[in-house]
Amino acid sequence: MSKPPSDPPRRPPAAFTYEDEATERHDNGRQAERRRKPESFSENIVVTADEDDPFLNPDKDLSAVPVATPLRRRTSFGKIAAGAFGILLSLGIGLWTDSLIRDLFTRADWLGYLALAVLAVGVLAVLALVIRETSGMMRLAAVQAIKAEAEAAMVETRPAKARAVVARLVTLLSANPETSKGRATLKATEGEVIDPPHLIALAERELLTPLDRKARALIVNASKRVSLVTAVSPRAVVDLLYVLYEAVRLIRAMAELYGGRPGTLGMFRLLRDVLAHLAVTGSIAVGDSLVQQVLGHGLASKLSARLGEGVINGLMTARIGIAAMDLCRPLAFHALKRPGIGDFIGDLTPSMSPRGNTP
C-alpha cells in the first residue's frame, strides 16, 4: 500500500530589494549623458513654420504661381521728358489752331464760327475722355486701397477698421447683381461678428465667391479659345496676335468683374503690371519644357506639335488670367483657395482629369 504524497516543502520567507524601473532608466540616461563626448552646435538655427514644412504638408503645391502685386509708381527721367515734350506739343497745337481760326475769320466769318464750334466740340470730348480715364484710374486705386486696408485691419484688435473696409467693399460691388445675396447676408449679420479677421473672411466668402466662380469661367473660356486657335492657325504670328488679343480682353473683363472698370490708360497700366509679373516669375516660358513640367514627360512625347503648342498657349493664358485676378481682386485670398495652374489642366486636356477617364 503506497503512501499518500506529502506536501512540498515550504520556502522560508526572505527579504528582497525592489528598484524602481523608471529610476533605473533615468540613472542610465544620466550615465549616458555623462559618457557623451562634448560637441559644438551652430547657433544659426532656422525654424520652419508648420504650414511651410513639406513633411507636415505633403499636399502643399510648391510650384504654385506667385501672387501678382502692382508695381510701385516711381518718377523717372523718361516720364519727365515725356511730360515736358507733351506740354510743348500742346502749345504748338494751340498756336496752330489759333492761327487757323484767325485765317478762317479773315476769309469768311461763317468759316471762323464753324471752326470755333468744331473746336468747342473737340474740347468737350477731350474733357469727357479725361474724366472717364481719371474715374477709371481712381476705381483701380480704390481696389488696391481696399486690399491694403483689409490686410492692415486683420491685425487690429478692434473691428472698426474691418467694418469700414467691408462697407467700402459693399459700395464698390453694389452695382453687381451677383453680390446681392452676399450684401444681404452681411447686412443681416451686421454687428454680430466683432473679430476683424473673421469679419474680413465673411465678406470675402459672401461677396467674392460668386465673382471668383465667374472669373474662373472667364479664364477657362479664354484658355480654350487660345488652345483651339493655336492648334488650327497656319502661322505663329497669328497665335501671338490672338494670345495678345485674348489677354487684353481677359484683363479688361477681370477688372470690370471686380468693380475696376478701367479706361484706356488703366488698361495699359494693368497690362503692364501683369506682363511685368509674368516676366519676373518666368511664367512666359514657351517650349517643350513647359509641357513636360506641367503635363508630364510621357504625355508631352505623345502630343502632336500643334496640339502641344495649343496647350502651352492655353496655360500661358491661364497664368495671365490668374495674375489679372490677383491684381483686380479687392481682397487677397485668405478664406477662399487661390486658383493655380493645376486647376485648369483638366479643362484644357480632359483626358488628364478624373472625370475624363470615367466611362
From Swiss-Prot:
Basic and acidic residues composition bias: residue spans: 23-40
Transmembrane segments: 77-97, 111-131
Superkingdom classification of source: Bacteria
Membrane topology qualifier: Multi-pass membrane protein
InterPro entries listed in its UniProt record: DUF697 (IPR021147), UPF0283 (IPR006507)
Disordered: annotated segments: 1-43
Keyword annotations of the record: Cell inner membrane, Cell membrane, Membrane, Transmembrane, Transmembrane helix
GO cellular component terms listed in the entry, alphabetical order: plasma membrane
Location(s), subcellular: Cell inner membrane
PANTHER family: UPF0283 MEMBRANE PROTEIN YCJF (PTHR39342:SF1)
Family: Belongs to the UPF0283 family.
Name this polypeptide is given: UPF0283 membrane protein Rleg2_1967
